[in-house]
């Protein structure tokens, strides 16, 4: 109360009944609706008084039940509509507050949406059937996340569906498969879609698997993590095991293995083959939903420890990725199939007796008609079995998305110095004795001799120390080299036919355009010679071999692919970067020396013709005419023919080499144009001159016998090679073909390639390389 209104201050007077003061607390607590009622009561009282004293009309009062108010209420009661043109609500768009409805099972994604990829089609239940069924027994569609299905190409959608049907046992009594697509077709993206779908969905409205292990080469672990982040936009985290202490690794793996929750924070483990082998005891204790083995041809030997460790995993879903499931023989192929689906082909002995022996006899060029018929019968039987669990697409699919690719096998003549050193080595008594000791199986001595000859075919610099020391095979060769010969810190390209040709071609490429070049070799010593040549000609270059760290490799690749970079050459060790590396900054590639395993060369040569390439590509494979390099090329052709028969189901693959041809590694004819062409017994050529072109349906994936054959520089698709043939005078023969069905015409030296207009725009794929290893481990004897 105000002090001025207190009785002591008012002199005992009462407060006026008309004062307007209201205690603040009472005013605060008084509800607004009560105030309105009070004011309304006073107003009505005033109106009644006025009516009694005057003839004023009463005001019109509107009530809520008038027609106008009802119309307004009806408008306001309309259902909310999203103010977006052509908006289609999802399944939850009709949900409202109120009484809880009965739970209805629905697929995670709309199976009727545009580009929807439905992996499992649920039964079409009627309303009556749904009412009579238990909610837990209703099956739903399994639909790939639109985030992924909208970017998958047609062949990738087919691959995801195939793998899903295999791991779910819908294609037979098995749960494993082999994804055998060739390089560049997106095997990684297909696996990301499969894993993401299985982790989130099933026909029973719950995850199919709770965790997955992906095993890959150590250099690809980080790449897998990048792929998941790239395609899923960070929606899922992976546990990538790379480096770290043993204690931290054990703790992380135990936590991953023991966690059986269906909603893990890191449901995917990325681990290398080596790390998995070390910690297999931890990972094999508990069940795993699925295992994926990248570069699965590493499991070609069923007796090694890594294979045995992976077989110990408690999982029935196994996916193996390999663009080259047959690299050397059918025994390796059996190991891969047996890993994903044990007992599908029986035991190793059963497979050898029932399939391998018969098929190999029929593959021989001197086999009888009966043996060939028997081989064909067994081949069809094997294909029928494995077709249930293997999917194979060639990179011919890429012709729809990439520019044309020209591939050339160039036979370069040895220089007089190389020729004399090669002949002296083969005539050496010590070499003859060592070769006589190894009739059927390779010995360490024979392998060393083969490596020596391979290096000699590349450049005498690679064996100069052996020549100077007069080692086996070079006892009388010290005087063959020039007097002023200095192999250290200097290179003379004129001493090697292949280096001489390379020198001319690099100069022509540099002078006639802005093309970049990749140089690949199996030996780091050869990369040293590339580096000396680049410094001598003042070419900008970068180099990648097994000594470079993984982090630095990525920076080097990005620098080379930058169009503004001054790097002209990329020098690459085939074993260090032959897998997964993306070098689309270059469109010309030289494979300087062949590998025993055709898969290694194929992987290395696929570095430039990949997603993102916008220029026509030229692949040059250099071999020394008539030398051991041509013998290696013939073995590659034989192995690829076997793969074509079994994997690609190519029944028309001709048999061109006998076993004796393949064993005859050390024969040498210095005057031959091409030992490979002679052994092909080509029916389209007369005296090494092509009289008929290859069939129209062939390309660079076909057998060498179905390529273009050139004994001169007329008709070549590349003006750079045509000019170098004339200038270097060291080319004896060329096989060439293209990737697309386009007419090949000779290109004048003043013109650019006709294919330069092809500029498709596709995804850029990050990649990582493998470790360096230049051993001839794939040589399997004579």
Swiss-Prot record:
GO terms for cellular component: nucleus. Transmembrane segments: none annotated. Its EC number is 3.6.4.-. Residues 1-20, 741-753 have a biased composition (Polar residues). Residues 168-343 form the Helicase ATP-binding domain. A motif (DEGH box) lies at residues 294-297. GO terms for biological process: cell division; chromatin remodeling; DNA synthesis involved in double-strand break repair via homologous recombination; double-strand break repair via homologous recombination; double-strand break repair via synthesis-dependent strand annealing; meiotic DNA repair synthesis; oocyte fate determination; oogenesis. It is found in: Nucleus. Residues 1-28, 741-782 are annotated as: Disordered. It holds the Pfam family Helicase_C. The modification Phosphothreonine is found at residue 22. The keyword Iron does not apply. Belongs to the SNF2/RAD54 helicase family. This is DNA repair and recombination protein RAD54-like.
């Amino acid at each position: 109360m105000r002090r001025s209104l207190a009785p002591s201050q008012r002199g005992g007077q009462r407060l006026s009944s008309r004062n307007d003061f209201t205690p603040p607390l009472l005013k605060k607590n008084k509800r607004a609706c009560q105030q309105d009622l009070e004011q309304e009561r006073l107003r009505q009282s005033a109106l009644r008084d006025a009516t009694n004293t005057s003839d004023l009309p009463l005001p019109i009062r509107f009530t809520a039940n008038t027609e106008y108010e009802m119309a307004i209420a009806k408008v306001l009661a309309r259902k909310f509509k999203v103010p977006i043109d052509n908006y289609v609500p999802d399944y939850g768009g009709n949900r409202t507050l109120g009484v809880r409805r009965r739970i209805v099972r629905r697929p995670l994604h709309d199976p009727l949406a545009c580009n929807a990829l439905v992996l499992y089609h649920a039964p079409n239940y009627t309303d009556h059937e749904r009412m009579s069924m238990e909610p837990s027994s209703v099956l739903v569609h399994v639909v790939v996340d639109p985030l992924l299905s909208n970017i998958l190409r047609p062949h990738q959608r087919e691959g995801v569906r195939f793998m899903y049907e295999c791991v779910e046992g819908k294609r037979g009594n098995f749960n494993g498969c082999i994804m055998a697509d060739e390089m560049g077709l997106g095997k990684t993206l297909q696996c990301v879609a499969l894993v993401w779908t299985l982790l989130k969905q099933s026909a029973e409205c719950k995850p199919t698997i709770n965790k997955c292990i992906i095993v890959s080469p150590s250099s690809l672990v980080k790449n897998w993590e990048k792929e998941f982040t790239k395609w899923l936009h960070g929606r899922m985290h992976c546990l990538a095991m790379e480096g770290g202490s043993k204690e931290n690794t054990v703790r992380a793996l135990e936590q991953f293995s023991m966690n059986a929750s269906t909603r893990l924070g890191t449901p995917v483990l990325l681990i290398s083959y080596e790390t998995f082998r070390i910690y297999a005891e931890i990972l094999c204790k508990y069940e795993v939903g699925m295992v994926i083995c990248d570069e699965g041809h590493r499991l070609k030997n069923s007796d090694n420890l890594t294979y045995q460790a992976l077989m110990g995993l408690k999982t029935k879903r196994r996916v193996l990725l390999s663009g080259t499931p047959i690299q050397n023989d059918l025994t390796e192929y059996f190991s891969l199939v047996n890993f994903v689906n044990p007992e599908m082909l029986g035991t190793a002995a059963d497979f050898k007796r029932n399939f391998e022996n018969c098929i190999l006899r029929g593959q021989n060029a001197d086999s009888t008609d009966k043996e060939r018929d028997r081989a064909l019968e067994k081949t069809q039987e094997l294909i029928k079995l494995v077709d249930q669990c293997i999917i194979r697409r060639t990179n011919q699919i890429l012709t729809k998305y990439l520019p044309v690719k020209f591939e050339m096998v160039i036979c370069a003549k040895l220089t007089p110095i190389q020729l004399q050193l090669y002949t002296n080595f083969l005539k050496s008594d010590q070499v003859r004795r060592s070769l006589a000791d190894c009739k059927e199986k390779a010995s360490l001595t024979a392998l060393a001799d083969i490596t020596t000859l391979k290096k000699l075919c590349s450049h005498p610099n690679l064996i100069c120390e052996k020549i100077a020391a007069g080692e086996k095979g070079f006892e009388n060769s010290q005087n063959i080299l020039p007097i002023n010969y200095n192999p250290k810190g200097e290179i003379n390209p004129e001493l090697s036919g292949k280096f001489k040709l390379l020198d001319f071609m690099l100069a022509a490429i540099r002078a006639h355009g802005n093309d970049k070049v990749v140089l690949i070799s199996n030996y780091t010593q050869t990369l040293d010679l590339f580096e000396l040549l680049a410094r001598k000609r003042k070419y900008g270059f970068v180099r990648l071999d097994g000594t470079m760290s993984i982090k630095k490799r990525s920076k080097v690749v990005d620098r080379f692919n930058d169009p503004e970079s001054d790097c002209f050459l990329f020098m690459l060790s085939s074993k260090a970067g032959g897998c997964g590396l993306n070098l689309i900054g270059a469109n010309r590639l030289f494979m300087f020396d062949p590998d025993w395993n055709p898969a290694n060369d194929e992987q290395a040569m696929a570095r430039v013709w990949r997603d993102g390439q916008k220029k026509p590509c030229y692949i040059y494979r250099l071999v020394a005419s008539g030398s051991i390099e041509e013998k290696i090329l013939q073995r590659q052709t034989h192995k690829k023919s076997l793969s074509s028969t079994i994997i690609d189901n190519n029944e028309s693959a001709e048999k061109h080499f006998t076993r004796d041809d393949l064993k005859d590694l050390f024969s040498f004819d210095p005057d031959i144009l091409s030992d490979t062409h002679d052994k092909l017994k080509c029916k389209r050529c007369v005296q090494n001159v092509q009289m008929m072109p290859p069939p129209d349906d062939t390309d660079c994936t076909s057998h060498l016998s179905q390529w273009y054959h050139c004994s001169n520089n007329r008709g070549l698709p590349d003006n750079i090679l045509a000019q170098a043939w004339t200038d270097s005078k060291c080319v004896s023969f060329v096989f060439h073909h293209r990737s697309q069905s386009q007419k090949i015409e000779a290109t004048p030296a003043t013109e650019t390639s006709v294919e330069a207009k092809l500029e498709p725009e596709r995804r850029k794929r990050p990649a990582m390389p493998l470790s360096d290893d230049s051993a001839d481990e794939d040589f399997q004897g004579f």
